[in-house]
Amino acid sequence: MGDFFFILLSTALVNNVVLVKFLGLCPFMGVSRKTDAAIGMGLATTFVLTLAAGASWMVEALILEPLDLTFLRILSLILVIAAIVQFIEVVMRKLAPGLHRALGIYLPLITTNCAVLGVALLNIQEGHGLASSLLYGFGSASGFTLVLVIFAGMRERLAQLSVPGPFAGAPIAFISAGLLSMAFMGFAGLAPN
């Protein structure tokens, strides 16, 4: 039980995929203008990342390693991730059309989100079992969602302020991301790397 808590804590806060591993920066900067879109993207990514982490373990342990096909790892993981994202898109279009429209092009781009593929590959590299893999994916996705929603809140607040001209837009967003990253550095003492 302690190992599961450690995995969740370290992936969500200490080794955050966005702020420490620099994975998923495209949706981090692109979808973080509105909190609603950030929450939707975070939830969709959480579902995809958790399923992809478990599916990547199954593909690796049940197909690639026994058949000595590990050279097909990246290709097979991309296919698995693409199938999961297509499933999410169909479900979201049916159940939440407003959210589907708000996410726009970023929803199909979860397929190419380097955070999803990166977490799947890191999961395999660290040699987790199935339960640990699912928790590793969920923790990474929770950290991604947490950072995305906090950053969206910061950007919404900044949009209401009068920012000096040279800092308006992307510069103030990068400065805010740096400050957020420094704040998350405070979690570094909670768990060893």
From Swiss-Prot:
Q: A Pfam family for this UniProt protein?
A: Rnf-Nqr
Q: Is the keyword Translocase in the record?
A: yes
Membrane-topology annotation of the record: Multi-pass membrane protein
Q: Where is this chain primarily localised? A: membrane
Enumerate the subcellular locations listed in this protein's record, separating them with semicolons: Cellular chromatophore membrane
Keyword annotations of the record: Electron transport, Membrane, Nitrogen fixation, Translocase, Transmembrane, Transmembrane helix, Transport
Presence of the UniProt keyword Cytoplasm in the record? no
Look up the domain of life of the source. Answer: Bacteria
Q: What is this protein called?
A: Ion-translocating oxidoreductase complex subunit A
* InterPro entries (UniProt xref): Ion_transpt_RnfA/RsxA (IPR011293), NqrDE/RnfAE (IPR003667), NqrDE/RnfAE_oxidrdctase (IPR050133)
Cite the source lineage.
Answer: Bacteria, Pseudomonadati, Pseudomonadota, Alphaproteobacteria, Rhodobacterales
Q: Name one GO cellular component term.
A: plasma membrane-derived chromatophore membrane
